[in-house]
From Swiss-Prot:
The lineage of its organism: Bacteria, Pseudomonadati, Pseudomonadota, Gammaproteobacteria, Pasteurellales. This is Dual-specificity RNA methyltransferase RlmN. S-adenosyl-L-methionine binds at residues 188-189, 220, 242-244, 321. Its EC number is 2.1.1.192. The keyword Transcription does not apply. Specifically methylates position 2 of adenine 2503 in 23S rRNA and position 2 of adenine 37 in tRNAs. m2A2503 modification seems to play a crucial role in the proofreading step occurring at the peptidyl transferase center and thus would serve to optimize ribosomal fidelity.
Length: 393
C-alpha cells in the first residue's frame, strides 16, 4: 500500500464516526446493496431472488411496510419484521423557494442534514449530503464553518433520495418532475466517506432500485487524491472537481486541503480517473466559485486555462452565495462575464451556473444543517425558522 493510500485510509478512519448501533438492533435494509441483501436472504435460507423483489418494493414503489409487499409470502414477511426494518431519514422542516427549489432538513439521530431538490425544464436534480458537517474548512463554504461531526451511513445517504422521491412523487403520477439526476454535492466531502458513499451510489445505479445512468450520478470532491484513486477502481460515475483557484498559493489559502494534495496531484488523479471512466463522455466538470477580487480576475482565467489545457472538461462558474460572517464578496456580473469570455476564447465550454434556492439558503455553499457546531456558532442565523414542519411521507 502506498504512503498516500495509507494516509487516505487514516483520514477516512478519522472521519468514520458514524453512529454505532447495538448488535441487538434490527438490520436497516437501506444499508444494504442488492448483493448484500441477497447474501442476507441466503443466510436466512431463502432464495436470493427475494432480495430483488424487496429492492423493487423499497425503491420502485417507495414501500417501507413489509405487510404491503404482496408477492412476498406471509411467513417471510413475519421473519423480516423480526430482524429487519426499512428506515430513511425523516423530514423535520421543508422550505420552498420562489423558483421551485425545495430544501429539506432531514433528521439523522439528534442532528440534521440538508437535501435540496432542484427542478428544471428538462431534468430534476437532487443534491445529497454525505456527512454531518465537513472537515475540509474551505473558507467560502457555509457547511465548512460548522466543523465535522460524523459520516452518514448508507441508509442516511440513499434514504435522502427515497424520502425526496416520496415527497415529490417519484412513486406516482403527481405532475411534479421526478428525480432524474443525483449529485453528491450537499454537506460534507464524499471521498472521506467512501465506505458508505460507494454502496449508496451503487443503489442509485441499480436497475432494481433507482436505475440511474452513470452520467446522471455525480460525485463532487474538493480533491482527496488517494480516495479518488481508490474510487476509480470501485465505481464509475460522473466526476466534478471543486477547484476554485488556478494556482496553489491561492488554493492553499481558500481550500486548506490543497496543502496536502496540490493542483498537479489532483489533476494527475483526475486524468487517471478519466482514462477508465465513460460516465460523462470522458469529461470532468470543473467547479469554480467566483469570489470578488480574490479569484475572478482576467489573470486568474488565463491561469485556469493553463491548468486545464490538457483536460477534457466542462467548466461551471458559480456565483458565490453569501452567508453570515463570510469574508468574501460576490463578483459583479461584469467580472463574471469577463472571466467566462476569457476562458471561452481558449475553446472551453463554460457555463455560469444559475443560482437556485438562494432565498432559502439552498444555493451552492450555503448548506449547513443543524449540526453540533464545532465552531460554537449558533444556527439561529439560518433561515429554517421560516420553514414549516412537515408530516413525513
Amino acid at each position: 500500500m502506498s504512503e498516500q493510500t495509507q494516509t487516505c485510509a487514516s483520514e477516512i478512519q478519522a472521519t468514520n464516526v458514524a453512529v454505532q448501533h447495538p448488535k441487538s438492533e434490527k438490520i436497516n435494509l437501506m444499508n444494504l446493496t442488492r448483493q448484500e441483501m441477497r447474501e442476507l436472504f441466503a443466510e436466512m435460507g431463502e432464495k436470493p431472488f427475494r432480495a430483488d423483489q424487496l429492492m423493487k418494493w423499497i425503491y420502485h414503489f417507495g414501500e417501507d411496510n413489509f405487510d404491503n409487499m404482496s408477492n412476498i409470502n406471509k411467513v417471510l414477511r413475519e421473519k423480516l419484521k423480526q430482524i429487519a426494518e426499512i428506515k430513511a431519514p425523516e423530514v423535520s422542516v421543508e422550505q420552498r423557494s420562489s423558483d421551485g427549489t425545495i430544501k429539506w432538513a432531514m433528521q439523522v439521530g439528534d442532528q440534521q442534514i440538508e437535501t435540496v431538490y432542484i427542478p428544471e425544464d428538462d431534468r430534476a436534480t437532487l443534491c445529497v449530503s454525505s456527512q454531518v458537517g465537513c472537515a475540509l474548512a474551505c473558507k467560502f463554504c457555509s457547511t465548512a464553518q460548522q466543523g465535522f461531526n460524523r459520516n452518514l451511513t448508507v441508509s442516511e445517504i440513499i434514504g435522502q433520495v427515497w424520502r425526496a422521491s416520496k415527497i415529490i412523487g417519484n412513486f406516482g403520477v403527481t405532475g411534479v418532475r421526478p428525480i432524474t439526476n443525483v449529485v453528491m454535492m450537499g454537506m460534507g466531502e464524499p471521498l472521506l466517506n467512501l465506505n458508505n458513499v460507494i454502496p449508496a451510489m451503487e443503489i442509485m445505479l441499480d436497475d432494481f432500485a433507482y436505475g440511474l445512468s452513470k452520467r446522471r450520478v455525480t460525485l463532487s470532491t474538493a480533491g482527496v487524491v488517494p480516495a479518488l484513486d481508490i474510487m476509480r477502481e470501485k465505481i464509475d460515475v460522473a466526476l466534478a472537481i471543486s477547484l476554485h483557484a488556478p494556482n496553489d498559493e491561492l488554493r492553499d489559502e481558500i481550500m486548506p486541503i490543497n496543502k496536502k494534495y496540490n493542483i498537479k496531484m489532483l489533476m494527475d488523479s483526475v486524468h487517471k480517473y478519466l482514462e477508465v471512466s465513460n460516465a460523462n463522455h470522458g469529461k470532468v466538470t470543473i467547479e469554480y466559485v467566483l469570489l470578488d477580487h480574490v479569484n475572478d480576475g482576467t489573470e486568474h482565467a488565463h491561469q485556469l486555462a493553463e491548468v486545464l489545457k490538457n483536460t477534457p472538461c466542462k467548466i461551471n462558474l458559480i456565483p458565490w452565495n453569501p452567508f453570515p460572517e463570510a469574508p468574501y464578496g460576490k463578483s459583479s456580473n461584469s467580472r463574471v462575464d469577463r472571466f467566462q469570455k476569457t476562458l471561452m476564447e481558449y475553446g472551453f465550454t463554460v457555463i455560469v451556473r444559475k443560482t437556485r434556492g438562494d432565498d432559502i439558503d439552498a444555493a451552492c455553499g450555503q448548506l449547513a444543517g443543524d449540526v453540533i457546531d464545532r465552531t460554537k456558532r449558533t444556527m439561529e442565523k439560518r433561515k429554517f425558522g421560516k420553514g414549516i414542519a412537515v408530516q413525513n411521507h
